[in-house]
Structure formats: C-alpha cells, structure tokens
A protein has these predicted regions:
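Alpha/beta-hydrolase-fold enzymes
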Residues: 1-18, 140, 144, 159-262
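Short, surface-exposed "cap/lid" segments of acyl-processing enzymes
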Residues: 35, 42-115
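Alpha/beta-hydrolase active-site loop
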Residues: 120-141
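Alpha/beta-hydrolase fold nucleophile elbow
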Residues: 131-132, 141-154
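Short beta-strand/loop motif that positions the catalytic acidic residue
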Residues: 294, 300-302, 306
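Conserved alpha/beta-hydrolase "acid-adjacent" motif
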Residues: 307-313
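Catalytic histidine-centered segment of alpha/beta-hydrolase-like enzymes
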Residues: 308, 328, 332-347
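Catalytic histidine neighborhood in serine/cysteine hydrolases
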Residues: 314, 319-336
Length: 394
C-alpha cells in the first residue's frame, strides 16, 4: 500500500495546534471585547465655521504658534462617497494632525448626509454652488485673493473641475488618488462602470444608496475584503490595539452617505462612459471644463496598488493642464493606505506641507484691497445720503 504524501498524524497534530491557539485567543477575547475600547475617530478639535443646507465647513484649531502657521489656508475636499473622517482616524495615524503640526491652516468640507430632497443636485450645484461659496468664505475670512485646494478621490475630481472654472481663486492645487482619465481597463471598477445602466439605477433609487456602493466596492476584491480581513480579526481578537484599529476602520468604511442622484448620473455618464474630463470636453454649469486653464502649481499623488483608482486613471492629468509647475508622486500603497499606513504617514502630509511652503515663499501675494472705484461709489452714496438728510431736517 502506498504511503500518503502527508501523514494523517501530521495533519491531526497541526489541527490540534491550531485549536489550542484558537482556544487561547478565545479565552482572551472577552477581556478585550467587553473591556474599555478606544475606538473614537475624528477626535482632532475643530470649529464649524460655515453651514449651507447639509454641508458644513470644518476649521481645525492650530497646534503650533500662530506666527508659524502658513498664511494661505488649505481647503480639503473629500469625496461624496464615505466620509472625511478617514483623514483623522486616530492619533499617530491622522493626515489632519500631520498637516497641522507642519503649520497648515486647515479647512475641510463635510458633505453631510444627502436626503431625498437632494436627489436633483448636480455636479454644478456642488462645484459652482457649495464649493464656490466655501472658497469665497475662506478668502473673505483671510482677506486673500486665492487659497490652496486639495481634493481626495471624487473630491479631487471636483477640485480639478473647480480649478479649471475658477483659476483666479486657487493658488496651489493638490490632487490625491483622483480619477481624471477613465479610459482604462486597469482595475475592475473601471471595467464594470463602463456598462452600468446609471439611468435605471438613479430613476429607481433617487439618491444612490451608500450601502449598495459599499457592497460593490467589497465585491471588487471579495476574498481579501470579505474573508481574509475577518480571518485576520479572529486571529488577533485578543490584541487590544489590533481590535481598536480594526473597529475604527470599520466605523469609517460603513459610514456611507448616499450620493445625490443627478450628481451620480452625470459623473458616471460624463466620466466613466464618455471620459470627457481629461479631454476638456466636460460641461459643468454651462461652461466647458478646459484643463488648460489650470495654470496654478499642481501636485498629483496616487497609489501604485490602488484597485479603485489605478495609476492610469491619475497620471495623465499633469500632462493635460496648463501649469508649468507640476509633479507626480506615486506611492507604493493602495487607495486607503496612502492616508492611513504608517509609512505613508511619514511621507504624505510632510510632502504636501513642504510643497506648499516652497510656493508660499516663492510668490507672496498681497492681501485683497477694495477697488478704488468701489470706494468712490461709496462716497457718492454717502454724499447723497447726507444731502437728503439735510432736506428732511428743513
């Protein structure tokens, strides 16, 4: 009789060993899971300084002396999908804290949670409405003609559109994992989206459900995102630090607002189906989005292993804009790792801060002054007012 290649006693021994480890983990689990856990996210102090409908503007409090803070503030625009809290997961793993420590005066858009009344809001409403109002608010608060702008994922696409339509208001533009070229077969998402019947989906749901989009993202890599991840959790269930980090990430992943229906419809049709943006053919608010009008400095980050927004979707942008000061940075990480991995934490935030500081020193812009003509009009108005008051006294 032939001997088995793997003796049964070896298999049984391995099973017994694994069972012993599982039992040890299970014995520790109640102490960890039922004990005090620090799973709070987005704990960095901020003030809500502007509100419009569901949209809020966060202004983070400085952590260094005011005189050391960069004069030109940075506005960060996150995607409509998921929440901006991912940039502030925990101390030591927070893009927000890193930027503050490096002297950035930081603002962040909180898109909130769309309701049924928001289903007809378009890209124009978000870019030329909410974003433009927020940019004007910050410019007025700081008495500056231009501010710095940074976009993340779909929020980065919005920032590219905004900078092309309102270049006079943006000093420096930073894009991170930002899709602009949708004519690529890299990544399953781009292949899927080309055949999505977006009209049927939006007509049926109104707003695009966040839970449905989350399921779609999980199905892009089900083995890793739906099996391996939870196997890893079970194997580390007795490790308090691991459990806390795991829960923080799960909180962010499954905090998924719906996306306004008309915005989703236009984004899928104009970008995924027709690839209009990178060709400077996309129309927003009745105006063509001409990328050549992006003449301000541009810093473009993307991840080498990003399965949602692959390098091919990001790296073309710098060759299509009108700016002569552009830089591409490809990090050895994925879509989320660029913001939360320990290695990228040491490079991502400091690189952005350093880049902005260099350009702040190169070209210092004067503060906004009221136009002389407007002053003259004001004086005439005052004169008329005084004259009319004298007549009334008589």
């Amino acid at each position: 009789m032939a001997q088995p290649k793997i003796p049964i006693d070896l298999i049984l021994s391995k099973m017994a060993e694994d069972a012993g480890k599982a039992q040890a983990r299970a014995e520790k689990a109640p102490d960890v899971l039922l004990g005090p856990l620090d799973t709070q996210i987005a704990a960095t102090p901020y003030d809500v300084v502007y509100e419009e409908d569901r949209v809020k503007l966060k202004h983070y409090r400085p952590v260094i002396p005011t005189e050391a803070v960069l004069k030109t503030p940075l506005l960060v625009v996150y995607a409509l999908i998921n929440r901006e809290t991912m940039l502030d997961l925990q101390p030591g793993r927070s893009v927000v804290q890193n930027l503050l420590k490096d002297g950035i005066d930081l603002y962040m858009v909180d898109w909130g949670y769309p309701t049924r009344k928001d289903r007809y809001l378009s890209i124009d409403d978000h870019v030329n409405g909410y974003m433009d109002n927020i940019v004007d608010f910050i410019r007025k608060e700081h008495n500056l003609p231009k501010i710095n702008l940074m976009g993340i994922c779909m929020g980065g696409t919005f920032c590219v559109i905004y900078s092309a339509l309102h270049p006079e208001k943006i000093k420096n533009l930073t894009t991170t994992v930002t899709p602009t070229n949708f004519d690529t077969d890299q990544g399953l998402l781009h292949i899927w989206m080309k055949d999505v019947d977006v009209d049927r989906m939006v007509d049926a749901f109104g707003n695009m459900p966040g839970d449905m989009m989350n399921l779609g993202f999980l199905l892009l890599n089900p083995a890793r995102l739906m099996i391996d991840k939870y196997v890893g959790f079970a194997e580390n269930i007795g490790n308090k630090d691991f459990v806390e980090n795991f829960v923080r990430m799960e909180k962010w992943i499954f905090d998924s607002p719906d996306v306004p229906g008309e915005t989703f419809r236009q984004f899928v049709k104009d970008c995924y189906h027709k690839n209009l943006l990178i060709q400077s053919k996309m129309v927003v608010g009745g105006k063509r989005v001409d990328l050549k009008k992006i003449t301000m400095p541009l810093l473009n980050f993307y991840g080498k292993y990003d399965h949602l927004v692959p390098p091919a979707a990001c790296e073309v942008l710098t060759s299509k804009v009108g700016s002569k000061d552009t830089e591409d940075i490809c990090l050895d990480t994925g879509h989320i790792g660029i913001y939360v991995s320990s290695r990228c934490q040491r490079e991502f935030g400091p690189r952005i801060a350093g880049w902005l500081k260099e350009r702040e020193e190169e070209k210092k812009e004067s503060r906004v002054k009221k136009p002389p003509a407007r002053k003259a009009i004001k004086k005439k108005t005052n004169a008329k007012t005084k004259a009319s008051s004298k007549k009334s006294k008589k």
